[in-house]
């Protein structure tokens, strides 16, 4: 387990884009280790798996209880209502539609511009709250082909937001080049078995919002793309751990 007694950036604060899923929970732990003060922001855009909004609360409280040194750094949580955006960004995440590949090569779970909107709104909040760092769980390794998860997209957003706000904006993406097995490994490095257990039990990834089926890797339907990535990554990580 990594020593978390002293932040790497003792005078810096960060705002974490926090959905309550595996990736953002790992990013929150990463930020709490690294920065002196961390706040979180979530977005309610009419997603079908609205259960993630309650998962956010469980993960935050679990982190504070299990890791008091992180709890001391964990600040306020904000939830932004983006129902209007969800209404125009129709996808299988916001409507009762089949999860399948589309003619353009993207899955029907792709919400057009989602990360662009999230980062723009988060940057406005960060500006008001005095944060120079945004932390997001975007990843171009296990990302289902979403173009707004690529690092070149994030770099372009970082430049645009910095110019538009006339301030230095850093978008940190600690998972950008990690597959799901490496993401599980990072969580274990950050918080050991306690953090792994919290992510397995309390975070939510399933596109269908299933919380009735418990697997070794957590709750979910087990066959949507998000569950498959999480399950396969969990198995690969466990197989890589020395007996």
Swiss-Prot record:
Taxonomic placement: Bacteria, Pseudomonadati, Pseudomonadota, Alphaproteobacteria, Maricaulales
Coiled-coil annotated residue ranges, if any: none
InterPro entries: QueC (IPR018317), Rossmann-like_a/b/a_fold (IPR014729)
HAMAP family: QueC (MF_01633)
Residues annotated as binding ATP: 18-28
Top-level enzyme category: ligase
UniProt cofactor note: Binds 1 zinc ion per subunit.
Family the UniProt entry places it in: Belongs to the QueC family.
Keyword Isomerase: no
Pathway: Purine metabolism; 7-cyano-7-deazaguanine biosynthesis
Keyword set includes Metal-binding: yes
GO BP term, example: queuosine biosynthetic process
Disulfide bonds: none
Catalytically driven reaction(s): 7-carboxy-7-deazaguanine + NH4(+) + ATP = 7-cyano-7-deazaguanine + ADP + phosphate + H2O + H(+)
Record keywords: ATP-binding, Ligase, Metal-binding, Nucleotide-binding, Queuosine biosynthesis, Zinc
E.C. no: 6.3.4.20
Protein name as annotated: 7-cyano-7-deazaguanine synthase
Cofactor(s) demanded: Zn(2+)
Species per Swiss-Prot/TrEMBL record: Maricaulis maris (strain MCS10) (Caulobacter maris)
NCBIfam families: 7-cyano-7-deazaguanine synthase QueC (TIGR00364)
Known function: Catalyzes the ATP-dependent conversion of 7-carboxy-7-deazaguanine (CDG) to 7-cyano-7-deazaguanine (preQ(0)).
């Amino acid at each position: 387990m990594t020593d978390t007694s002293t932040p790497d950036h003792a005078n810096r604060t960060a705002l974490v884009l926090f959905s309550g899923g595996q990736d953002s929970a790992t990013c929150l732990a990463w930020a709490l280790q690294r920065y002196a003060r961390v706040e979180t922001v979530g977005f309610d855009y009419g997603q079908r798996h609205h259960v993630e909004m309650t998962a956010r609360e469980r993960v935050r409280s679990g982190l504070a209880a299990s890791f008091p040194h992180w709890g001391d750094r964990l600040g306020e949580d904000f939830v932004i209502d983006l129902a209007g955006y969800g209404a125009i960004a129709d996808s299988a995440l916001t409507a009762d539609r089949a999860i399948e590949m589309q003619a353009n090569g993207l899955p029907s779970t792709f919400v057009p511009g989602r990360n662009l909107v999230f980062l723009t709104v988060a940057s406005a909040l960060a500006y008001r709250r005095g944060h120079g760092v945004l932390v997001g769980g975007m990843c171009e390794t296990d990302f289902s082909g979403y173009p707004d998860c690529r690092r070149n997209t994030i770099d372009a957003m970082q430049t645009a937001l910095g110019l538009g706000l006339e301030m230095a904006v850093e978008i940190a993406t600690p998972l950008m080049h990690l597959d799901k097995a490496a993401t599980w490994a990072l969580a274990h490095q950050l918080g050991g078995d306690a953090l792994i257990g919290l992510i397995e039990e309390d975070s939510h990834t399933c596109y269908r919002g299933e919380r009735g089926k418990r697997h070794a890797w957590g709750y979910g339907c087990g066959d949507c793309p998000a569950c498959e990535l999480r399950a396969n990554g969990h198995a690969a990580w466990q197989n890589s751990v020395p007996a």
